[in-house]
């Protein structure tokens, strides 16, 4: 590898991006994933929204997957999708296949005291109800990011994925 080669990133996902079709839209390829656990965080549902968030929690742990080999351009796509409500941070996860500790990027909810946070988010429940809409919406968001045509993201994409919780 030369210094001009693009840097590769690892991204820990724990919500809608666990769905292979959703990850494929963001990456424009099939994701290479490894199951992992993030200690020191808790995953919550968000009232009125169909996606979860994580915030720091001393006794918490979040199961998810590490997407490996993420390029700078793909990482930018994650940033676009996650928007301003999440902050990208570097954390350490434990791979479930070999117990190796790995540094990864993940997205933490900015408002750690958000009153909309509650309960446990359920991936299978989400998948049945929301997966197809997320694929369509994320595709529109990334198309808008490449060519906004003078429109705001909301104008181009429509209202983002409310759940009616």
From Swiss-Prot:
One of its GO terms (molecular function) is acyltransferase activity. The active site is at 82 (proton acceptor). Expressed in floral organs, leaves, stems and roots. Substrate binds at residues 14-19. Keywords: Acyltransferase, Transferase. It comes from the Eukaryota. The keyword Plastid does not apply. Induction: Expressed constitutively. The keyword Metal-binding does not apply. CDD domains: GGCT_like. Its EC number is 2.3.2.-. Belongs to the gamma-glutamylcyclotransferase family. PANTHER family: AIG2-LIKE PROTEIN D, PROTEIN AIG2 C. Putative gamma-glutamylcyclotransferase. This is Protein AIG2 C. It comes from Arabidopsis thaliana (Mouse-ear cress).
């Amino acid at each position: 590898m030369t210094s001009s080669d693009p840097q590769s990133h690892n991204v820990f996902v724990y919500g809608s991006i666990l769905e292979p079709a959703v990850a494929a839209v963001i990456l424009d390829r099939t994701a290479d994933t490894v199951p992992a656990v993030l200690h020191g965080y808790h995953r919550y549902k968000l009232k009125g929204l169909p996606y979860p968030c994580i915030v720091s929690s001393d006794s918490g742990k979040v199961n998810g997957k590490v997407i490996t080999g993420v390029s700078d351009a793909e990482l930018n796509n994650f940033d676009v999708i996650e928007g301003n409500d999440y902050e990208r941070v570097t954390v350490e996860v434990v791979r479930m296949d070999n117990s190796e500790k790995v540094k990864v990027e993940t997205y933490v909810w900015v408002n750690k005291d958000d009153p909309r946070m509650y309960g446990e988010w359920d991936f299978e429940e989400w998948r049945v109800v929301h997966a197809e809409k997320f694929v369509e919406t994320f595709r529109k968001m990334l198309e808008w990011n490449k060519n906004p045509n003078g429109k705001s993201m909301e104008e181009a994409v429509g209202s983002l994925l409310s759940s009616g919780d």
